[in-house]
């Protein structure tokens, strides 16, 4: 991928002061890479992960009393606090305490002195969609949950809910912190954001042609021989396959760039290689490509990146 430690340090150097990870291992990798910023795990791991969370100072999300108590008890053994973020389910129905049950949940677990509520968050299901009805419902539920906590004297801590799309499209939900996700890598989450912010993809993937051949009509290519040559095409091989992240489901459904021209990937993508075709026929003023072994192929990105 992009390199977790490198991305984290770049984000911090650019003004971020908090980091989020998807797994405990990701958090540990950052700590071992000398990243000292606060890290929140955006899920609730198994209770057996509690010692690692505490040792590496990774704050988990909490939404079940069983994990909350196990985590707190382990912290108590060490004589330290157990910081966490409360995940609130406002409609995505993936993880979290139901929005109208947050007070009861906190009362159920807050008897344990080690627990330390550092933040409260939710996640939007439709921030990148055209309609705003469901988005508005989630915002309303989340603000009600935050208000309910405050009304009974529970400080929700850092309030955050804006993913990439919401950060760009809805500044009113920035609250105390935003979670810059896929757009951190220069990707737009929806068409609407393209006119609102200028992003440049952080990654490009290039390869070199390792073999070429001109096939007669009806000759097959790759596993299953699902692709058949229409004749007058050159088949070129590049050393990139599904083991490198080029999804096999994209077989025959994606294009590459050679010498500034789009070329069609053909045949099933192999583990470590794939092929594309180049039409050798000449149409009017269309420039005829004739790629050779060693020529550059752009898998992801633009020519010249």
Give names to the regions the model predicted.
Residues 41, 117, 209, 265-266:
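A structural signal for short, hydrophobic beta-strand segments that form beta-sheets
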Residues 23, 43, 124, 163, ...:
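Residues that line or immediately flank small-molecule/substrate-binding pockets and catalytic motifs
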Residues 1-14, 68-82, 90-208, 212-216:
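Active-site loop/helix belt of alpha/beta enzymes
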Residues 212-305:
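C-terminal accessory subdomain/extension
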Residues 16-17, 35-37, 56, 79-82, ...:
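Short coil/turn connectors at secondary-structure junctions
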Residues 1-58, 62-71, 169:
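N-terminal active-site wall of soluble small-molecule enzyme domains
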Residues 59, 91-94, 237, 275:
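Short aromatic/hydrophobic contact patches that present stacked aromatics
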């Amino acid at each position: 991928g992009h390199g977790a430690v490198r991305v984290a340090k770049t984000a911090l150097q650019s003004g971020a002061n908090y980091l989020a990870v998807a797994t405990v291992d990701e958090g540990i990798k950052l700590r071992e890479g000398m990243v000292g910023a606060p890290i929140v795990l955006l899920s609730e791991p198994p209770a057996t992960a509690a010692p690692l969370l505490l040792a590496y100072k990774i704050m988990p999300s909490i939404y079940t009393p069983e994990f909350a108590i196990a985590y707190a008890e382990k912290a108590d053994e060490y004589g330290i606090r157990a910081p966490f973020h409360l995940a609130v389910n406002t409609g995505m129905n993936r993880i979290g305490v139901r929005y109208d049950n947050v007070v009861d949940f906190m009362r159920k677990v807050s008897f344990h002195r080690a627990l330390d509520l550092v933040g409260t968050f939710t996640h939007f299901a439709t921030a990148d969609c055209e309609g705003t009805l469901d988005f508005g419902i989630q915002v309303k539920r989340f603000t009600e949950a935050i208000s309910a906590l405050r009304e009974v004297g529970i400080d929700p801590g850092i309030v955050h809910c804006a993913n990439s799309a919401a950060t760009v499209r809805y500044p009113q939900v920035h609250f105390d912190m935003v979670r810059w996700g896929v757009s951190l890598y220069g990707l737009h989450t929806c068409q609407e954001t393209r006119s609102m912010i200028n992003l440049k993809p952080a990654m490009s993937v290039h390869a070199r042609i390792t073999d070429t051949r001109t096939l007669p009509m009806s000759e097959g290519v790759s596993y299953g021989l699902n692709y058949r040559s229409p004749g007058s095409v050159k088949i070129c091989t590049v050393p990139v396959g599904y083991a490198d992240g080029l999804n096999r489901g994209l077989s025959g459904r994606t294009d590459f760039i050679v010498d500034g021209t789009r070329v069609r990937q053909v045949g099933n993508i192999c583990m470590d290689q794939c092929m594309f075709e180049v039409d050798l026929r000449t149409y009017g003023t269309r420039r005829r490509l004739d790629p050779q072994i060693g020529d550059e192929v752009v898998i992801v990105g633009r020519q010249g990146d």
